[in-house]
């Protein structure tokens, strides 16, 4: 794979931040050292320091390759690459895929929802969630569903939209959650009451 990071300078900052949601995802799901590196170097990344951009892209590609090599047909561990996407895809669909919200922005919000759900499930995240939220907010990434999208949905509609996700099995929504920072898992058993609580928090 060849990546010319100098091309990133041709993109508006909004698109850079949309892509960054996918980059930090790799730190959250499987590589805590990479996650900490991203947190420590946020200012250099957002000023497009070439050395740091190369490092970020390299580790993202490397981590994805590790997962895909283990599960080429997405039957098991590859599902963790979808952290934030089950919620994010629902947000995009409710917004009719309009350009007012990019895919990366929807994933960014979805990651926040997945972190909250992980915490409610009792996983070891409470003290770390605010650190990630602060990082997102400092970079001006999306962490809340915009009001114009909130007005289009309800708990019932949001869950019905989530049911179209590819991870749904036998009409049951499977979620990608975190046990701790750097360790994700496919959750097919969880409290639906807690899921409702997370959705309501973001749509109200």
Regions found by a protein language model. Name each.
Residues 1-43:
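A glycine/threonine-rich phosphate-anchoring loop and its flanking beta-alpha core
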Residues 2, 82, 176-178:
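Short beta-strand segments
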Residues 8-10, 88-89, 183-184:
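Short, acidic Gly/Pro/Ser/Thr-rich loop/turn segments
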Residues 21, 123-204:
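C-terminal charged capping/lid subdomain of soluble metabolic enzymes
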Residues 21-26, 58, 113, 160:
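Generic alpha-helical structural context detector
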Residues 25, 29, 47, 120-123, ...:
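Residues in soluble alpha-helical coiled-coils and helical-bundle/repeat scaffolds
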Residues 36, 41-156:
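Active-site segments that bind and position negatively charged phosphate/pyrophosphate groups
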């Amino acid at each position: 794979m060849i990546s010319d990071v100098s091309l990133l300078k041709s993109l508006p900052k909004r698109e850079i931040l949309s892509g960054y949601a996918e980059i930090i995802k790799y730190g959250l799901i499987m590589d805590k050292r990479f996650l900490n590196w991203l947190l420590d170097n946020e200012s250099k990344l957002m000023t497009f320091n070439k050395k740091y951009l190369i490092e970020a892209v390299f580790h993202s590609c490397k981590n994805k390759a590790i997962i895909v090599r283990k599960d080429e047909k997405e039957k098991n561990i590859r599902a963790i690459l979808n952290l934030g996407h089950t919620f994010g895809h629902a947000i995009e669909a409710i917004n009719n895929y309009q350009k007012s919200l990019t895919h990366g922005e929807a994933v960014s919000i979805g990651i926040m929802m997945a972190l909250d759900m992980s915490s409610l499930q009792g996983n070891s995240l409470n003290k770390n969630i605010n650190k990630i939220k602060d990082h997102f907010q400092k970079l001006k990434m999306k962490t809340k569903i915009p009001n114009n999208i909130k007005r289009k949905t309800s708990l019932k509609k949001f869950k019905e939209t989530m049911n179209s996700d590819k991870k749904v099995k036998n009409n049951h929504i499977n979620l990608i959650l975190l046990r701790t920072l750097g360790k994700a898992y496919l959750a097919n058993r969880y409290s639906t009451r807690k899921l409702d609580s997370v959705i309501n928090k973001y749509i109200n």
